[in-house]
């Protein structure tokens, strides 16, 4: 077993997180380790592509676009001594997210529109990391707005960008260049890269706030 980052390992060729919990989305469980499926989680894909985050485990994380909690569940395994504010706007996936929250004490579910951070500003404290996976045209505006409200100075962001959600007619590479340029004024880019073969026409961007 090879350790990749806090509570994240390669078990033979399978990515897993160390966990005291059972399966959340049908993933396999191996004696205290949960399979982390890269085709179901862009963060898992990023890690398998070779980029890792240096997390202590006690961070406060704002997760924008939590959906039904697939990636949230693994991130909660990693920051097991911290807190994840999980924001999701759609009611149906939020119901599944609530199932996860019932057995975890480090996830706070928030049924809000991530483009309106002022609506949950009375709940969310300053965070060390913003993780965003929102397939909307204005996703960089959403990231900047939330960073302004919640991200600590020199806090980190990880955003998953789907080219077709921003401009379905442009070449993905042109969309990605535009997104990176849009981020430059507010963030220092640490690393960006493709999520192929796991997610087509997607990139990850890891950055920190000036």
Swiss-Prot record:
PROSITE patterns: FIBRILLARIN (PS00566). Its EC number is 2.1.1.-. Signal peptide: none annotated. Transmembrane segments: none annotated. It holds the Pfam family Fibrillarin. Changing residue 89 to A: Strongly reduced RNA methyltransferase activity. Reduced affinity for S-adenosyl-L-methionine. S-adenosyl-L-methionine binds at residues 70-71, 88-89, 113-114, 133-136. InterPro entries: Fibrillarin (IPR000692), Fibrillarin_CS (IPR020813), SAM-dependent_MTases_sf (IPR029063). Keywords: Methyltransferase, RNA-binding, rRNA processing, Transferase, tRNA processing. Gene3D superfamilies: Phosphorylase Kinase, domain 1, Vaccinia Virus protein VP39. Changing residue 70 to A: Loss of RNA methyltransferase activity. No effect on affinity for S-adenosyl-L-methionine. Coiled coil: none annotated. SUPFAM superfamilies: S-adenosyl-L-methionine-dependent methyltransferases. Involved in pre-rRNA and tRNA processing. Utilizes the methyl donor S-adenosyl-L-methionine to catalyze the site-specific 2'-hydroxyl methylation of ribose moieties in rRNA and tRNA. Site specificity is provided by a guide RNA that base pairs with the substrate. Methylation occurs at a characteristic distance from the sequence involved in base pairing with the guide RNA. NCBIfam families: PRK04266.1-2 (NF003276). Interacts with nop5. Component of box C/D small ribonucleoprotein (sRNP) particles that contain rpl7ae, FlpA and nop5, plus a guide RNA. This is Fibrillarin-like rRNA/tRNA 2'-O-methyltransferase. It comes from Archaeoglobus fulgidus (strain ATCC 49558 / DSM 4304 / JCM 9628 / NBRC 100126 / VC-16).
